[in-house]
Amino acid sequence: MLWAFNRPAKALPTMVHLGYTNCAVCHISPQGGGLLNAYGRSIDLAQSFRGGDYQPSTNKFVKWLSWDDRITQDVRNVTQGQLSTATDEPTIGTVRARFMYRNATELGKGWRLSAVVNGENRSVKRPNLSYEPPIQPEEVYLTSALVSYRPKSTLEFSAGRDPLPSGVNNPDLTTYIRARNKYGYYDAPVQLKMFWWGKHYQINPYAFGPSGTEPTGAKESGGGSLAEFYLLGKHTTTVLGVNTLHGEASTLHRTMVGPYLRLGLRSWGILAEHDITNRSLTASPTSFLQHASYAQLFWYPREWLLISAIGEQLQTQRPFQEHLIAGRFEVTSRFSNHITLGVTSRFQENMISSQFAPSVALQLALKTVQ
């Protein structure tokens, strides 16, 4: 069984819990999942066990490194120890460590350069499927390199290499909705995308092409669009959206439609997504459907403590028939804006072979704060 560590923090439940409808409130990039802006850094500290008011550093050397606050950057480390097993297989212990450097440089007049560089001791590829092979990663890997232009506060254009926009935008890229739809750790195609958002909506069309790291036959080009709408209510945050995508490679064509929901009710909330993907092989008339489902119920008993129960299901039609279900229970504690500790218990069951695969993991995430 393959299961890997998440990104360092559970930013998405925090966003929903606090009543924010989109990522642009706290993140430099409107796609989210990246560096925090000044307001986001204040929320990051306030929602931790340490608490307090965020104050940017006044150290002269730090100011020099940040080019007088034009550069936002951080260094992150996520280390995970995991014990996993499966039916008729031994227990395996693994330790994975990932280092990440992220940089966003404001050039003025709305222009921005950004990049993310990763290093790791053990790669975590998508499942090696005959019809959709994974990218073979290197020890040091560039997952994002973008030029962005924001002509107004609610409109941004970006070009370069980056993960594709996704619905729920779950930070765990090993979930079925991510790993089985080419949203893995190393899937970072070249793309041109637009973000346009307002109080009640966000529209995100995009076009993409191969980055050059894909296996032969899997160099995919295509386009898609993400659209979501916000239904605001008293003490309630409801976001309904859909992500559509069509991609073509020399060996495979695919079309995906994925409706999703983000619901927040004060201290608890729900994240849900169901992706339907139709794939057709170019060398034969074969086409087959895939259904991938994700649902997360989360609760904040304290601002710094997140408890989640997660359920997943994957069904793929013949000739590549699969039926997997998975469940997970997570407890994540944000001790400060530098330190996050998480404990996870997970199982996966193959409904065709009856193989049962449980695992437990302890994860420590560390980061610098500018």
Residue ranges and their predicted role:
Residues 67, 88-97, 138-143, 186-190, ...:
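Residues that define the transmembrane beta-barrel architecture of outer-membrane proteins
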Residues 22, 333, 354-370:
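Outer-membrane beta-barrel "beta-signal"
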Residues 107-114, 153-157, 163-166, 199-205, ...:
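Repeated loop/turn-to-beta-strand initiation elements of outer-membrane beta-barrel proteins
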Residues 71-83, 115-119, 159-161, 203-209, ...:
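Transmembrane beta-barrel strands of outer-membrane/channel proteins
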Residues 79-82, 124-144, 152-230, 239-243, ...:
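Surface-exposed coil loops of outer-membrane beta-barrel proteins
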Residues 52-87, 91-93, 109-115, 157, ...:
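Transmembrane beta-strand segments of Gram-negative outer membrane beta-barrel proteins
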Residues 220-317:
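Detector for outer-membrane/organellar transmembrane beta-barrel domains
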Residues 20-30:
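The canonical Cys-X-X-Cys-His
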